[in-house]
Amino acid sequence: MTISPPEREANGKIVVDRDPVKTSFERWGKPGHFSRSLAKGPNTTTWIWNLHADAHDFDSHTNDLEDISRKVFSAHFGQLAVIFIWLSGMYFHGARFSNYEAWLSDPTHIKPSAQVVWPIVGQEILNGDVGGGFQGVQITSGFFQLWRASGIVNEQQLYTTAIGGLIAAGLMFFAGWFHYHKAAPKLEWFQNAESMMNHHLAGLLGLGSLSWAGHQIHVSLPVNQLLDAGVDPKEIPLPHEFVMNRELMAQLYPSFAKGLAPFFTLNWGEYSDFLTFRGGLNPVTGGLWLTDTVHHHVAIAVLFIVAGHMYRTNWGIGHSMKEILEAHKGPFTGEGHKGLYEILTTSWHAQLGLNLALMGSLSIIVAHHMYAMPPYPYLATDYGTQLSLFTHHMWIGGFCIVGGAAHAAIFMVRDYDPTNNYNNLLDRVIRHRDAIISHLNWVCIFLGFHSFGLYIHNDTMSALGRPQDMFSDTAIQLQPVFAQFVQNRNYLAPGFSAPNALASSSAVWGGDVVAVGGKVAMMPIQLGTSDFLVHHIHAFTIHVTVLILLKGVLFARSSRLIPDKANLGFRFPCDGPGRGGTCQVSAWDHVFLGLFWMYNCLSIVIFHFSWKMQSDVWGSVTAQGVSHITGGNFAQSANTINGWLRDFLWAQASQVIQSYGSALSAYGLMFLGAHFVWAFSLMFLFSGRGYWQELIESIVWAHNKLKVAPAIQPRALSITQGRAVGVAHYLLGGIATTWAFFLARIIAVG
C-alpha cells in the first residue's frame, strides 16, 4: 500500500454533462436510426439481418469512447429493469396461481406448482395432481424453497414483493434514461477504477451481504425455526413483529435479550445461538443450517466492507490499480503487467471478456455446490429442481465462458494496440502462441485417444463376452485415487481445523445418509472406475473447447495464413476472392465452433450428473436401507459406450416417449419439436449460399411472372448469417430436447 503526498494526485469529482442527447421518440421510431446506411431503409432482405447484428454493437455507431461508455451504462439499467420485471412475474405467479401455502404446510408430500393451464382444446390434461387438492404444472425452478428460506409465509407477502419488483423496474428504466439523456457521466468517471472497486466491494457486495444477513437474522431465522417446529404458517407472527419485539426473538434465540452489549464488549460467542458453525445439513429440511448461512453472510459482509477500503481515491491512502499492475513483474516475465491498466480502462471488451469468463466459471461452481450443499429447505429432496438447477447453471456458465472468449477476440481485433504492449505478458503470450496452441492440441489428442480408447476397449471386451478383461470395479480397476483422497481429507477436515463443527461441509465427502420424509437428501458419493473414465472425457472436451476459443483469441489479429487478419475485422467469411482455403478463420468463426464443443462438453457433464445421482444418491429410505432410483447401475453400465446408450439414454427416455395422454405430455411434444428444431439447424450448417441464391432467383422469377414481385430484393443469407442461424437452432434444439428428456424422466420417477 502507498500513501501519496497531497499534491501528487488531483481529487476526483463526479462530473456529468447536462442534457447531452435529446429525448426523441420520433428518432427511436425509425428502424436503424443509429447507422447512416441502415437508416435509409431496406433495399434487400440483408437489411433486417444487419439491423439485428448492429443494434447493440455500440462500437459501430460511434468512435467516441465516452458515448459508447454512456450507452453501455444506460443499457445496464435496462437489463436490470428487465430482470426486476421477470422476478416480479415469478413472485406474482407464486401469489396468484400457485399452491405455495399448501406446499409450505407439507413440503415432503405436496409438489410445487405455480401454473394452471386453461382448458382450451384439451390442454387441461397438463394440470397434474401435485397433492393437497391442487391441479397444476409441477415447477422445478426452486422458487418455493427460496421463498421459505426468505421467511415468506403467505401469498400476501408474495404480492407485495411482486409490486416492489415493478417499482424497482420503473426506477431502473428511469435511471437508464436519466443517465444518458439528462445527466450523463464523463469518461473520467467510467475510468476511475479505484472508486468503482471501493463502491462495488463495500457497497454492492459488502452492504448487500450485510443487509441480506440482517433480513435472515430478523425475519428468516425465526420464521424457519417455527416452521421447522411444525407451527402453522398462519399462526406465525408477521415479520415486523420479530423486528420490533425483542422479547419475541429472545424466546427463540436467548442472546437477543442481551442486545448489543456482547458485540461492544467483544463477547461475540454469546451470539452463537443464531450465528453457528455446525456444518452438514439440517435433518428436518435437508438444507444447510440457516444459522450457518447467516454466519457466512455476516462474515462475507465484513470481508467485503474491509476490501472496499483498499483502493486509493481522494484520501491519498491505499492501493493504486496502475501501480499494482506495473509492479507485477518477475525475472522471466519481461515488462509484466505494464499496459494492462490502459487496456482495462479503455477497452470495455477486455473488461467484459474477463468478467464473462469469471462469472461463467462461478456459475459452474454454483451448479456443483447447489447439490452438494443444498442451501434452501426441502431443496435436496425435490429431485426435479435439483436436476434443473444443476443443468441451468452449467449451461449459463458455458455460454458465459464462450462469450468471454468472443469479447476477448473482439478486444484483440478492435482495441489492442501493439505499440502500448511491448514485451508485457500479453505480448509475450501472443509471441509464443504457436507453442501454446500446438501443446494444447497435443494434450487434446492425447486425452481424446486415451479416454475414448478405454471405452472402446470395454465395449469390445463386453461384445466378446470377456467381462474379466474390462476396466471396471469388479475386474481391472482404475480407481480415482486422488479424488477419493480429496473426499476423505474433506470428511476428516473438521476434526483437525474445526473441532466444534458437527459435520463436514457436505455429506458427499462421507458419513451418514441425510434423509427427509423417506427420501435421500444427500449421502456420501462413492467414486469408481466408471467415474474415472467419464472424468477423462470431461477433461478431453473441456480442453478442446479451450483450444478452439484460445486459438480464436491468440490468432484474432494475424496468422501465417492471413497476416493482415486485424484489417478484416472480427467476423468475415473468407480472405477475399482468389484466396482458396481462407474461409472460416475469423475470430467469430472460432466462437461459432467453440459453441458446439461447449455443447458437447456440457451435455456429457449433465448426463453424468443425472445418471450418477439417480444411481448412487437419489432414492427412498426404508428400514431395509436405501433403494436408489436406478439401483446403482452406474458403476456396471457407464464404463461402456453401449451402456451409456442403452442404460441411460434409451432406458431413461421411456418416460418422455410414453408421456402422451398424461400430465407430462407437453414434454413429449417438446422432445419431438426440439428434435425438429435441432434437425432444422443442419439445413443451415450443411448448405452452400449459392444453392439458396439460385433457388431464390427461381422463386423471384415466378413472382415476376405473376406481377407480385417484392419491392425489397430477396437475398440468400450470407455465410456468417447462415452459420449464426444454424448454431442458434442447434443449441436451442439440443438444450430443449435435453430439458424435456430430463424433466419427464425425473418428475415421473423422482
Curated annotation (Swiss-Prot):
Q: Which residues bind [4Fe-4S] cluster?
A: 574, 583
Residues annotated as binding phylloquinone are 692
Task: Kindly list the positions annotated as binding chlorophyll a.
Answer: 683, 691
Q: What is its EC number?
A: 1.97.1.12
Q: Where does this protein hold chlorophyll a'?
A: 675
Record keyword Metal-binding present = yes
The reaction(s) annotated as catalysed by this protein in its Swiss-Prot or TrEMBL entry are: reduced [plastocyanin] + hnu + oxidized [2Fe-2S]-[ferredoxin] = oxidized [plastocyanin] + reduced [2Fe-2S]-[ferredoxin]
For biological process, the GO terms are: photosynthesis
Q: Where are the transmembrane segments?
A: 72-95, 158-181, 197-221, 293-311, 348-371, 387-413, 435-457, 532-550, 590-611, 664-686, 724-744
PROSITE patterns in the record: PHOTOSYSTEM_I_PSAAB (PS00419)
Q: Which cysteines are joined by disulfide bonds?
A: none
Question: Which UniProt keyword terms apply here?
Answer: 4Fe-4S, Chlorophyll, Chloroplast, Chromophore, Electron transport, Iron, Iron-sulfur, Magnesium, Membrane, Metal-binding, Oxidoreductase, Photosynthesis, Photosystem I, Plastid, Thylakoid, Transmembrane, Transmembrane helix, Transport
> What does the entry comment about cofactor binding?
P700 is a chlorophyll a/chlorophyll a' dimer, A0 is one or more chlorophyll a, A1 is one or both phylloquinones and FX is a shared 4Fe-4S iron-sulfur center.
- What main location does UniProt list? plastid
One function term, GO molecular function aspect: electron transfer activity
Q: Where in the cell is it found?
A: Plastid, Chloroplast thylakoid membrane
PANTHER family per the UniProt record, alphabetical: OUTER MEMBRANE PROTEIN, OMPA-RELATED, PHOTOSYSTEM I P700 CHLOROPHYLL A APOPROTEIN A1-RELATED
Concerning NCBIfam families, the annotation shows:
psaA
Q: How is the quaternary structure described? A: The PsaA/B heterodimer binds the P700 chlorophyll special pair and subsequent electron acceptors. PSI consists of a core antenna complex that captures photons, and an electron transfer chain that converts photonic excitation into a charge separation. The eukaryotic PSI reaction center is composed of at least 11 subunits.
Stated name of the protein: Photosystem I P700 chlorophyll a apoprotein A1
Give the source lineage, highest ranks first. Answer: Eukaryota, Viridiplantae, Streptophyta, Mesostigmatophyceae, Mesostigmatales
Q: Tell me the gene name.
A: psaA
